[in-house]
Amino acid sequence: MFLEDASDALYPMRTYIESSMTEEGNSVANMMCLMTTRIEAIAKGIDKEQIASFVHAVLSANRIYVMGAGRSGLVAKSFAMRLMHTGFISYVVGETITPAIAEGDLIVAFSGSGNTKTIGDIAETAKGIGAKVALISSNPDSRIGRIADYIIKIETQRDPVTCDAHEYEIRQMLGEHRSFAPLGTIFETSSLIFSDAVISTIMTMRQIEE
């Protein structure tokens, strides 16, 4: 009898938990649909001539260097790995095995603001050496954008970062690197999908199978 009473007492709680889990599941699915719709709009808005120029730059480069800070850095590393798997010579800037850049190489910067200090410093150095600079950013009118040979604009409509004089890590520690709710990672997600699409296009052009 006691067990039956306890079970009856717990029934409303179980019902509430199950209902909450269903609502959370629906919320996640709805958010995925929202992000998919937003990324589709972003993809359609990217200049097709810019894409073609970028793909040509990748195909014609002697070596490809990639870089980014924070989440953008993770996207850059993913792109470098996929390039390597496709037969390109690719490096991540800052790794211990990365050789010096030279004329004829391409450096690809992933930066939402286009103003991250370390990324800008490296881009300017590479440009001075004679390498080509490509920028994946939501802000082409930026420090890196002004020296870039190729620009892919990822239009995210995110609020501007107002403290570009600080390093990404310093802004993060100070709490000045804000999350842009509800789609705070939309630039990185769109950049990742864009870079994967570039790889897929090159694989098709070169008739490479997975």
Where are these regions (language model features)?
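Glycine-rich phosphate-binding loops that contact phosphosugars or nucleotide phosphates
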Residues: Y65-A69, V75-T189
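An accessory alpha-helical subdomain
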Residues: L183-A197, T201-I208
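Active-site phosphate/pyrophosphate-binding segments
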Residues: K48-E49, S53, T204-E210
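Generic N-terminal amphipathic, Lys/Arg-enriched alpha-helix
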Residues: F2-K44
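A short, well-structured juxtamembrane/interface segment
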Residues: A43-S60
